[in-house]
Structure formats: structure tokens, C-alpha cells
Amino acid sequence: MEHSLIILLFTVLLLLTTTPGILSQPSPAVAPAPPGPTNVTKILEKAGQFTVFIRLLKSTGVANQLYGQLNNSDNGITIFAPSDSSFTGLKAGTLNSLTDEQQVELIQFHVIPSYVSSSNFQTISNPLRTQAGDSADGHFPLNVTTSGNTVNITSGVTNTTVSGNVYSDGQLAVYQVDKVLLPQQVFDPRPPAPAPAPSVSKSKKKKDDSDSSSDDSPADASFALRNVGSVCDAVSFCVMSVMLAWFYL
């Protein structure tokens, strides 16, 4: 009996000494939830003062394009977001005068299909290619220059500056601009180049020269025959004169 009591006490002591160690072990860390998909319009809504730009992003379908690009590929995107005050600076009726296609081009002109950090502006190559398309002069050129900490942007129609960094995560960069970027293709289209004058082919010119020569040949032959006839008449007259003179003598 005494022996059993000793074993029981020993077991209780063993449990008391090992339990705190078990209880003190940290529970496994819970993995953080993956970040939600990047949504440009939500970022702009959170920043405020981009109501008109958000409305145009949605109405043109560009917002859905950006959502798909950011969440289904590794390609970065840079957006120059004009504030609401930028749109109030436009001439009255400017947006309403645009066709649906031109509105899409206008919004796409504010999107660069690559990530551009603030430090990259100093070394970036001009003209920048936007999602609006051809960056050649007269179409959708966009040029960026820096002067100290100031980033200047020109489209050939609009000159403005970057006034703030709205958002940046290594894949998406959003910068606020002071004016709406107006592309040349929409707001200052160049007249089409005149068609070159039709050139006369060498073969046709040679044929024309040949025809001209052929036309002159009969005239030259006729002139020669007339000259021969005149000479013959003169000779005949002389012969007749000599014969008459000899006859009377």
C-alpha cells in the first residue's frame, strides 16, 4: 500500500513538472490572408478628388481592362490621374463633343503599359508609349522631362506637371497631374499628307518620243520630194532655154 502511494505521488509530480512546458509551447502562426486583387478605381476613390476620372474609367471600359492586366499578368502599369479640378479647366462641352472611341483613346492616353517609379522619370526614353497607341508625332506622343524634383509632361497639346504620388506598390504607380492630357490625334489632328504627283514612266516617255519621231517622218519626206521636184523644173527650164537659143541661131 505504501509502495503504491509513493508511485502515485511520483506520477503526480511528474505531470505537474511537464505540463507547464507543454502549455507554454507557442501555437503555430496563422498565415496572413493573401492581398485582394488590385483595383484602380478603389485606389482612386480612397485618395479622393478623382470622381470624373473614375466615371470615365468605368464608362469607357478601361477600368475593366486595367483590372484584368494587373491581376492576370506580371506587366506593370503607370497611370497619370487628372484631378476633378483638371476637368473643370477644360473648355465647356469638350468631353461631350467626343465620340465613344475618342473618349476611350483619351483615357487610355493617361495609361502607360509599364511600371514607372518616380526615380525612373529622369532616365525614361521619349516619347512614352501609352495604351492609346501610336506614339509618333501627330498621333499619341507623350514626353516626360525633369527639372530638379519637378516632372513635366507634354502631349503636344497639353503641358502639365506631376503634382503628387497617389499610389505605388512595385506593379502599379498612380500619379496626380494638374491638367487633363489631351492627345494630338483627337484634339489637334494633322492634315493628311498630299498624294505624290503621278510620275511618267520611262517606257511611256520613250513611246511618246517614238510616236513624235514617226509623226515628223512623213513631213520630212514630203519636204524632200518637193525640193527634188523644184530642182528638176529648174534644170528642164535651162535645157529648154539653151535649145531655143541654139534653134534661132
Curated annotation (Swiss-Prot):
Q: What's one Pfam family here?
A: Fasciclin
GO cellular component, as recorded? plasma membrane; side of membrane
Cellular compartment(s): Cell membrane
- FAS1 domain: which residues? 37-181
**UniProt entry tagged with the keyword Lipoprotein:** yes
Cite the residue spans of the region called Disordered: 186-219
Could you tell me the keywords of this UniProt record? Cell membrane, Glycoprotein, GPI-anchor, Lipoprotein, Membrane, Proteoglycan, Signal
| PROSITE patterns documented for this protein | FAS1 (PS50213)
Lipid modification (GPI-anchor amidated aspartate), residues: D220
**Would you indicate the residue range of the signal peptide?**
1-24
Classification via SMART domains:
FAS1
Q: Name one GO biological process term.
A: plant-type secondary cell wall biogenesis
The entry sums up its family as follows: Belongs to the fasciclin-like AGP family.
Q: Which PANTHER family match?
A: FASCICLIN-LIKE ARABINOGALACTAN PROTEIN, FASCICLIN-LIKE ARABINOGALACTAN PROTEIN 12
- Role noted for this protein: May be a cell surface adhesion protein.
| Name of the protein | Fasciclin-like arabinogalactan protein 12
Supply the source organism for this entry.
Arabidopsis thaliana
Which gene is this protein's source? FLA12
